[in-house]
Amino acid sequence: MARVKRAVNAHKKRRVVLERAKGYRGQRSRLYRKAKEQLLHSFVYSYGDRRKKKGDFRRLWIQRINAASRANGLTYNRLIQGLKAAEVEVDRRMLAELAVSDANAFAALVNIAKAALPADTSAPAAAAAPKAAKVAPAAATATAVKAVVSEKPAIDGAVAADGDEAPEGYAIKGNAESKKYHVPGSTWYNTTAAEYWFSTVEAAKAAGFEPAGGEARQQIKN
């Protein structure tokens, strides 16, 4: 059987490795074994850094956008919130480029964001409308509770509150919005504004109220 020396293939393999390692210092660029070891490490570093590069550039863009937006009287967070509310689809890379190269265009975007921002700085513009719509269910709940208490025949031991003074024989407070009742001496009894008064726990439960904090908290102590 013929002998295979693989000289050509071996030399080519070494040339490729040394060509890739020619930028390294010392033996890492001249000796095949050292160059091969260093290349294995370099491949690991390059794989991880290609992914870190995305985060590094994102942080750089945010710093540039923040500096330019503060120069126009707006913070980075408020700028992004305003652009989203105005439905302006510009990514951070282009915003950073405009902040560096075109100050007038960036200032125009800041003005658009300012105009789209809600008056309430703690609430986004898109969520303001649904919150207003939630008022109606709360009012309907209070009306339903009032109907339960005042319907005929009336529930024994339940009266609507008229002022802060408790009627004689009625010591349990009822809150229509939360539909919870509070017995004297409980945690939130003194801070709760009574909308209904009940003479017994059973009367409060019959009106559709639940114990605030659970049964253990709402027990009348003799």
UniProtKB/Swiss-Prot annotation:
Function: Binds directly to 23S ribosomal RNA and is necessary for the in vitro assembly process of the 50S ribosomal subunit. It is not involved in the protein synthesizing functions of that subunit.
GO MF entry, a single one: structural constituent of ribosome
GO cellular component: ribonucleoprotein complex; ribosome
Keyword list, A-Z: Ribonucleoprotein, Ribosomal protein, RNA-binding, rRNA-binding
UniProt entry tagged with the keyword Acyltransferase: no
Name the UniProt record assigns to this protein: Large ribosomal subunit protein bL20
Family stated for the protein in its record: Belongs to the bacterial ribosomal protein bL20 family.
Domain of life, source organism: Bacteria
